[in-house]
Amino acid sequence: MAAKRKLGKATDARLALLKNQVSQLLWNGKLVTTAARAKEVQKLAEKYITIAINSYKDTVTVEKTKIVNGQATTIKVVNDGAKKLAARRKLMASLNDLQEARREKETATEYKLRTKAVKHPLIEKMFNDYAPKFDAKTSENGQKGGYTAIYKMTQRRGDGAEMATIVVL
């Protein structure tokens, strides 16, 4: 296994930093940071996207019967399968639970109605957006990985650190 960069931080601070940066990258699609941090963030982001790709199709349809006004009605509910549930729990443990922000000129009630159904927006984005998109690319190209790219930028003015932008493709 490849050695991990220490990034000049204690272990707990380094892990928290990487967890925050990977979460922000996956949520926003783009992150500006130092080149060394970008390389570490890229490793983790690729790993988490691969976990989502390998399990996003695992669903189970269950029929539930509810009695409403004396009449029995059956409802089909789509649940996560065992593999997808394990992947979802792993991602929830590894990423921060970012919430959707209120849009401009959106009232509090509109915001609550819009976000009511989604409890973990970042995890849903991983399974509903990134996984199908990259799975289609993988099946079309026959190549796994390469979900992110690092673009080097100029040095930071204050300390001369090499900066980079990491992007989810």
Predicted regions and their residues:
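Structured, basic alpha/beta domains of bacterial-type, RNA-associated proteins
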Residues: A2-K6, Q21-L25, L31-A35, K39-L169
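Basic, ligand-binding patches in group-transfer machinery
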Residues: L17
